[in-house]
Amino acid sequence: MLTFLIPTAKEMTIPKESHPHLLPQDSQAILKIMAAMTTEDLAKSYRIKEESAKKEQQRWQDMASQQSLAYPAYQLFNGLMYRHIKRDKLTTQEQAYLTQQVYITSSFYGIIPANHPIAEHRHDFHTRIKIEGQSLKSYWRPCYNQFAKEHPQVISLLSSEFDDVFSKDCKQLWISPKFMAEKEGQFKTHSTISKKARGAFLTACMENNCQTVDSLKSLVFAGFYYHPDLSTDHEFVYIKKEA
């Protein structure tokens, strides 16, 4: 069985379905620090304006006082990649695939199933805080490595931000898809192409119920197709021709 890892997103939209917010034990130490920060501290940590930091401060304090609602993560996050993932009108098989084989890597919650209930928050591995004297990446590394040991065949749709959260020896069987546009024999990639393609790729995997590495090679989605000559055992390259 394939396991997919996807990142979080800064952009969020409130879905209809809500739940009580139950915070994992490993996240409590982070919440304690974030909820105690001033708007000035948050502005520096996030590299945002103080006006925006006030909104984030309220979210953290609501969580600390257990007043936050929680929403299925894959529905709450609404960044470019998420908007290209099929999230509505799923078949029973697609819903099972999304909730049982897709996991979200978070610097606040750890690694969670795609439908895990989470609260509105802003947090990533660039957030400048220390947890028990450790960086966020060091703090989460044991948890992330344990997940990798339990799920050896991972299809990673993660950005470079996560490269050194996992130890290298945990990623021996990982495959990272790469998405490129071809025009007049020239190949190019950029974040917009990649984010849209990640969502479309995951949707195609769900719709085709891909369960083996070889099944990924036959996928055609949003104009992309597998390119064997550019691919390696650990990097599957998908090309889209541009006019």
From Swiss-Prot:
What's a Pfam family this protein contains? H2O2_YaaD
What does the sequence similarity comment in the record state about its family?
Answer: Belongs to the UPF0246 family.
Cellular component annotations (GO), alphabetically ordered:
cytosol
Q: Which InterPro entries match?
A: YaaA
Q: Which domain of life is it from?
A: Bacteria
Originating species: Streptococcus pyogenes serotype M1
PANTHER family referenced in this protein's UniProt entry, alphabetically: PEROXIDE STRESS RESISTANCE PROTEIN YAAA (PTHR30283:SF4), PEROXIDE STRESS RESPONSE PROTEIN YAAA (PTHR30283)
**What GO biological process terms does the UniProt entry carry, in alphabetical order?**
response to hydroperoxide
Protein name per its UniProtKB record:
UPF0246 protein SPy_2104/M5005_Spy1788
